UniProtKB/Swiss-Prot annotation:
Organism placement in taxonomy: Archaea, Methanobacteriati, Methanobacteriota, Methanomada group, Methanococci
Family, as annotated: Belongs to the radical SAM superfamily. CofG family.
Designated name of the protein: 7,8-didemethyl-8-hydroxy-5-deazariboflavin synthase
Residues annotated to bind [4Fe-4S] cluster: 54, 58, 61
Encoding gene per record: cofG
Known cofactor(s): [4Fe-4S] cluster
Length: 356
């Protein structure tokens, strides 16, 4: 049996694990009792893939391109200004991990006047804060403590998917060619963000060959870090989607029942952390996941697509509102930083001034 790190009551965790196994079916429907809110939140955003090259070659990813595109400033500014006109409040900035290791990209950046991608990102984020009502949220792979510290100045929140904390899984088709997916590196960054008091989003990926024990262990690992620093505002429970162009195209997607069970366990373990499922990856079943205590839909864009899952269009906000209300909740727009973190203890003066 897996060791549940720092758990005060391992048997309690083992009991939660049983909810994912077959004898947990009777618990379906109990998860929504843990959601005391009368609303489900979402963030109206723009998705800006600054560069789609990546050092990692994950078995389930379609984002990475060898024939990469590095967006120029004008392209990015146009999207930000369009988002501003449509009332978006979040600018999701993303690019592949350690893109600076690609000499062609480094050369392109130098031609633009930047030594590295983080200088470019900082400049773009600063422009965004100064010229629009959007708040930057960056998710760009592994960053050092100092890099996080610098980006905190111009970001309302940041994120990194843990995906799974299993060393075994790291050596499978999912991550064997992805040095940045080594669990200890990702856990360290999540912890560094806590030390720096950065409001943070993380999550797990379900259906990439993990065991039920590894799912629970990953959630426990996230919770243990959060208990130390209190900075994790939401955890995404993301279901694997099979695509023809990926090495894992023959992998089965997790069933709705499996997702329900994982979501219930996540809510029981993570308690005060919001649980998010991407509505565009669960267009037929997302409404059912509210039974499991899901309380956030995440970022939804009226003007940009999901560049990580381009085959899955965002629902229209009116549609999201309709099936949220059908369940008995109201739909509430939020910022990329949760309300409890909007103070000088968590945000830079520049970001806080923009919000207030």
């Amino acid at each position: 049996m897996v060791e549940f790190l720092n758990s005060k009551n391992p048997q309690d965790i083992i009991d939660k694990l049983s909810l994912i196994n077959n004898n947990g079916n009777k618990n379906i429907g109990n998860g929504n009792k843990t959601n005391n809110k009368k609303y489900i939140t979402y963030s109206k955003n723009v998705f800006i893939p600054i560069c789609n090259w990546c050092k990692n070659i994950c078995g389930y990813c379609t984002f990475r391109r060898e024939n990469y595109k590095l967006m120029n400033k004008q392209e990015i500014k146009e999207i930000l200004l369009t988002g501003n006109k449509h009332g978006c409040r979040e600018a999701l900035f993303t690019f592949g991990e350690t893109v600076d290791e690609n000499p062609k990209i480094k050369e392109d950046l130098k031609k633009m006047g930047y030594n590295n991608i983080l200088e470019y990102l900082y400049d773009i984020s600063d422009w965004c804060l100064t010229n629009t009502d959007l708040l930057p949220h960056t998710n760009c792979g592994i960053l050092s403590y100092e890099e996080l510290k610098t980006l905190k100045e111009v970001n309302a929140s940041m994120g990194l998917m843990l995906e799974n904390s299993s060393d075994r899984l790291y050596n499978t088709i999912a991550h064997k060619d992805s040095p940045g997916k080594e669990p200890k590196k990702r856990l360290k960054m999540i912890e560094d963000a806590g030390k720096l008091k950065i409001p943070f989003t993380t999550g797990i990926l379900v259906g990439i060959g993990e065991t039920n024990e590894e799912i629970v262990q990953s959630l426990v690992d996230i919770n243990n870090i959060h208990k130390k620093y209190g900075h994790i505002q939401e955890v995404i429970i993301q279901n694997f989607r099979a695509k023809e162009s990926i090495p894992m195209s023959n992998y089965e997607e997790p069933t709705p029942l499996k997702m329900l069970k994982v979501l219930i366990v996540a809510k029981l373990i993570l308690k005060d952390i919001s649980i998010q499922v991407p509505p565009n990856l669960n267009s037929e079943t997302g409404q059912l996941f509210l039974f499991a205590g899901v309380d956030d839909w995440g970022g939804v864009s009226p003007i940009t697509k999901d560049f990580v899952n381009p085959e899955a269009p965002w629902p229209k906000i009116e549609e999201l509102k309709k099936y949220t209300e059908e369940f008995g909740y109201s739909l509430k727009e939020r910022l990329p930083v949760y309300e409890k973190y909007i103070n000088e203890n968590w945000l830079s003066c520049k970001v806080l001034e923009k919000i207030k």
